[in-house]
Amino acid sequence: MIGTPYTEGARRAMLLGCGELGKEVAIELQRLGVEVIGVDRYPNAPAMQIAHRSHVINMLDAKALRAIIELEKPHLVIPEIEAIATQTLVEMETEGLNVVPTARATQLTMDREGIRRLAAETLGLPTSPYFFCDTETEFNQAIGKIGVPCVVKPVMSSSGKGQSVIRDAAQSTKAWQYAQEGGRAGGGRVIVEGFIPFDYEITLLTISAVNGIHFCAPIGHRQEDGDYRESWQPQAMSADVLAKSQAIASKVVEALGGYGLFGVELFVKGSDVYFSEVSPRPHDTGLVTLISQDLSEFALHVRAILGLPIPNIHQHGPSASAVVLVEGKSKNIRYQGLADALAAENTQLRLFAKPEIDGRRRLGVALARDKDIESAVNKALDSASKVKVIF
């Protein structure tokens, strides 16, 4: 049962994290009559602008997080970022709090160690070789064992922060320092993993719903500096490799438990599929589903967490997304060129309405459909390039 917002019968959902992905989740929640409460570390975040009300707290502060949940008494708590005091969610779940998909899933995936150990050591899934390191000495020893090239990442980071590829041992000191600067909760533990010379990487959006496990068509993407630049759907792959990918994704999602959409990241080399990471929430590369599917990843996530069925997912054909990435400093961001950006057929645009920029930041995404993937990607890139950001 779903009541009406601002009434005693309202179904209340609290978003922990109010960025562009949270904003789309909030929109889908409101389409089904759910009262939305936004929480983030800074004011006027994108989802806060459309939430019924919002709060600014440090979500890594366990006392502050518990206090805001006890104040609002949400029926659903929806973590949208990693930098959260997840142990508080675990404790409150035992007291009756409904965390999406589960508090355990949120805690395991908040850092790379929990999910990597689950996938490789508990589930026995194929992954790259890896070591976790607390000190620079351990870090250098791990590089010696794995060899170069290898990849280093903070165990807790997002959007590529702190990630680098070491192609020569002489780069190790710089890579260690960069990883220490890039962690979401400050410096600390890192993962060093073998570099898989993959043919391509995919995000397999996997939904655990009341009527079973569902998959979106595979999404291909291009990364740069650890963050996605373009994504496209469907990624071409053989039926055998797709089946292997779906089997891996199913095992991970079922092990994490709960209802919701999961972004499962996989590497493909020949006929081999390797597990990389998973997010128990919509994925940035999945922004392409805003134009490629009848139900976007956000709509699917909301259906699942509300206990509603997903009878089918229709994919419209070759589609792509390209980010609007800007570097600068301003608290008065404005946009020009929108008419040019939207002049071509089957193009859309999402501007995230982020309140400020200080450095490099993703401010929007261009979306496109076309006759084939290459054409769709080029159309999305062309659209994104025509958006002019004024400071």
Swiss-Prot record:
It catalyses: N(1)-(5-phospho-beta-D-ribosyl)glycinamide + formate + ATP = N(2)-formyl-N(1)-(5-phospho-beta-D-ribosyl)glycinamide + ADP + phosphate + H(+). N(1)-(5-phospho-beta-D-ribosyl)glycinamide binds at residues 20-21, 80, 284, 354, 361-362. GO terms for molecular function: ATP binding; magnesium ion binding; phosphoribosylglycinamide formyltransferase 2 activity; phosphoribosylglycinamide formyltransferase activity. InterPro entries: ATP-grasp, ATP-grasp_carboxylate-amine, ATP_grasp_subdomain_1, PreATP-grasp_dom_sf, PurT, PurT/PurK_preATP-grasp, PurT_C, Rudment_hybrid_motif. Mg(2+) binds at residues 265, 277. It comes from the Bacteria. The keyword Transit peptide does not apply. It is an enzyme of class 6 (ligase). One of its GO terms (cellular component) is cytosol. The keyword Nuclease does not apply. Residues 117-306 form the ATP-grasp domain. ATP binds at residues 112, 153, 158-163, 193-196, 201. Pathway: Purine metabolism; IMP biosynthesis via de novo pathway; N(2)-formyl-N(1)-(5-phospho-D-ribosyl)glycinamide from N(1)-(5-phospho-D-ribosyl)glycinamide (formate route): step 1/1. Homodimer. Involved in the de novo purine biosynthesis. Catalyzes the transfer of formate to 5-phospho-ribosyl-glycinamide (GAR), producing 5-phospho-ribosyl-N-formylglycinamide (FGAR). Formate is provided by PurU via hydrolysis of 10-formyl-tetrahydrofolate. Belongs to the PurK/PurT family. This is Formate-dependent phosphoribosylglycinamide formyltransferase. It comes from Shewanella sp. (strain ANA-3). The gene is purT.
